[in-house]
Amino acid sequence: MKLLEEFIKEKGTVLPGNVLKVDAFLNHQIDPGLMQEMGKAFAERFQDLGITKIVTIESSGIAPAVFAGLALSVPVVFARKKKSVTLTDNLYTSTVYSYTKKESNDISVSKQFLTDADTILVIDDFLANGQAALGLLEIAELAGAKVAGIGIVIEKSFQQGRELLNKTGIPVYSLARIASLENEGILFLEEE
């Protein structure tokens, strides 16, 4: 998605350790116009798959997931990283490792909001090592839900995440695919 690539080039910052900081439009401050276009792009790609719900992880996946949900006219469910007094029982839970935070988190979805009647689209902000998406796939499997596709905002194609997700046989679509974050700047792969 050329618009997203422009945002990444203009407002993204490469940090040591192959970390891409995009808090100017995605991870801290959110650009609603960009989110709307991303939601439309995900909807166009997955509209014919019978999606009944979108599933993501808090917090940076929520905005793109909500805009995709608007475009597809389906609800959005986000896996919580922290338990709260209102989210204690009847949960599907998986453990995921965060590449940027260098820690593992249990993520949970209430059984009330995900069932074997659902066909879901998983949406996440980044694909690096694939752990977040795999955790959501595990939750879907526990619920008996069908996963029709995986939508990624920014994929670091030089890391193993895409390879791991491809092994699941579930279609993966990334709006921006980064080939490298080297000294010469951010290099993108061609659009899918």
Curated annotation (Swiss-Prot):
Q: Where in the cell is it found?
A: Cytoplasm
Alphabetically ordered keywords of this record: Cytoplasm, Glycosyltransferase, Purine salvage, Transferase
Pathway in which this enzyme or protein is active: Purine metabolism; XMP biosynthesis via salvage pathway; XMP from xanthine: step 1/1
Gene3D superfamilies, A to Z: 3.40.50.2020
Which GO BP annotation is one of this protein's?
A: xanthine metabolic process
Q: Which GO terms describe its cellular component?
A: cytoplasm
Q: According to the UniProt entry, what is the EC number of this protein?
A: 2.4.2.22
Q: Which residues bind 5-phospho-alpha-D-ribose 1-diphosphate?
A: A128, N129, G130, Q131, A132
**A GO molecular-function annotation:** xanthine phosphoribosyltransferase activity
* Residues binding xanthine: L20, N27, K156
* Pfam families named among the record's database cross-references: Pribosyltran (PF00156)
So what does this one do? Converts the preformed base xanthine, a product of nucleic acid breakdown, to xanthosine 5'-monophosphate (XMP), so it can be reused for RNA or DNA synthesis.
Family to which this protein belongs: Belongs to the purine/pyrimidine phosphoribosyltransferase family. Xpt subfamily.
The entry describes its oligomerization and partners as: Homodimer.
Q: What is this protein called?
A: Xanthine phosphoribosyltransferase
Question: What is the species listed in this Swiss-Prot or TrEMBL entry?
Answer: Listeria welshimeri serovar 6b (strain ATCC 35897 / DSM 20650 / CCUG 15529 / CIP 8149 / NCTC 11857 / SLCC 5334 / V8)
The root-end lineage is:
Bacteria, Bacillati, Bacillota, Bacilli, Bacillales
Q: Point out the gene that encodes the protein.
A: xpt
